[in-house]
């Protein structure tokens, strides 16, 4: 009984996260502004991390946790880079001094 409920909830979570990913992907492609695309990319990468976590639970392994960490790092670095580009127009300024 409990295993049936667990399978139902895991399957439902995968379906709902899949729908959320499709919606985020649509906003990523169709977003009118760059800020919309950045938010959609962050949301999509969070959904991907959740899907990988659920797949890790299904297969009863911790091997997928490294890929969750990799997706999180790539998402963070890309969000910071795009935010700096939107804010000032340059991602790297070529000097070691910070502008305060």
Curated annotation (Swiss-Prot):
GO CC field: plasma membrane
Assembly notes: May form a heterooligomeric complex that consists of seven subunits: mnhA2, mnhB2, mnhC2, mnhD2, mnhE2, mnhF2 and mnhG2.
Subcellular localization, as worded in the UniProt entry: Cell membrane
Membrane topology category: Multi-pass membrane protein
Keywords: Antiport, Cell membrane, Ion transport, Membrane, Transmembrane, Transmembrane helix, Transport
A Pfam family per the record: MrpF_PhaF
Record carries keyword Translocase: no
Highest rank taxon of the organism: Bacteria
Keyword Ion transport: yes
Gene (name only): mnhF2
InterPro entries documented for this protein: MrpF/PhaF-like
GO molecular function: sodium:proton antiporter activity
The name this protein goes by in its record: Putative antiporter subunit mnhF2
Organism this protein belongs to: Staphylococcus haemolyticus (strain JCSC1435)
Family membership noted in the UniProt record: Belongs to the CPA3 antiporters (TC 2.A.63) subunit F family.
TM spans (from-to): 6-26, 38-58, 62-82
